[in-house]
Amino acid sequence: VKIGCCVSLFHDAVFTLSELGVDYAEIGLSELSLHSGEEISERAERLSEAGVPCLAGNVLFPGELALTGPHTELSAISEYLGATLEKAALLGVRTVVFGSGGSRRAPEGFPREAAWEQLRGLCAELLSPALQKHGMTCCIEPLNRRECNILNTSEECACLVREVGKPNIRLLVDLYHFDLEREPLSVLAGYGDILAHAHIASAKNGRALPKEGDGEDYAAFFQALRSIGYSGSLSLEGSVSGTFEDCIAESAAYVRNFSALKA
């Protein structure tokens, strides 16, 4: 399993990840719209010089871009998506994460079934072809019900992935959201064919990054991943205590111990 770290492309700490024992950066995608291709290419060059691959990106859509409800604008969504993936390609991004709770949230009173169909259509008809152009994969991320009102569990997201039926639309499992939704680890057994990315943080400790003695059973999570043959990417996505460098280095080393264990 490759261990990554979620950090802004425009936070200079991103250039230190290799030194901290991290395999790749996972950057925020929605902020790319605020920067020119030239700026992004310059950051990409510096990442290359620092030996930090930028393999993943999250927050695919900004909160103000509605993906569900009566006021969605497919032309605006398509235009944003095309421009954002073009910029992500400059960085070498291979996996994009579709969490984006603000944009996918169904408006109050809007039928859930209609919102589901909008998201299914978005993934199948807009997102999948746009990804194919760049050889990217999108992983749908379950978000706990405090953050969004649709696609809250891995089971729901897996159902959507299978309904879409596209090889570049896959599933992400985030241990933080997984635990808040009280999903049993046993459900992971059914995702061996669609799981393509993972996030990790502690639900018991306010989304803090994993560290020894924090009360979480990370061994069971990694055992469940190993049992389905998962050997992909897993990103640290949580709050930092102390200095960024010390916290990331400690957490990456701790998590890597679990990922290296044999089944």
Say what each PLM segment does.
Residues 27-47, 100-107:
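Glycine-rich, proline-tolerant flexible connector loops at the mouths of alpha/beta enzymes
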Residues 2, 10-21, 77-78, 86-94, ...:
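Histidine-acidic metal/acid-base catalytic patches
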Residues 14-34:
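Basic, amphipathic N-terminal segments that precede the first structured/catalytic domain
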Residues 34, 64-66, 149, 182, ...:
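Short, function-defining helix-loop hinge/capping sites that tune catalysis or transport
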Residues 49, 67-170:
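Active-site acidic/histidine proton-transfer and metal-coordination neighborhood
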Residues 51-54:
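Short, structured active-site "lid" loops
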Residues 6-10, 28-32, 59-62, 101-103, ...:
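Active-site beta-loop-alpha junctions enriched in small/polar residues
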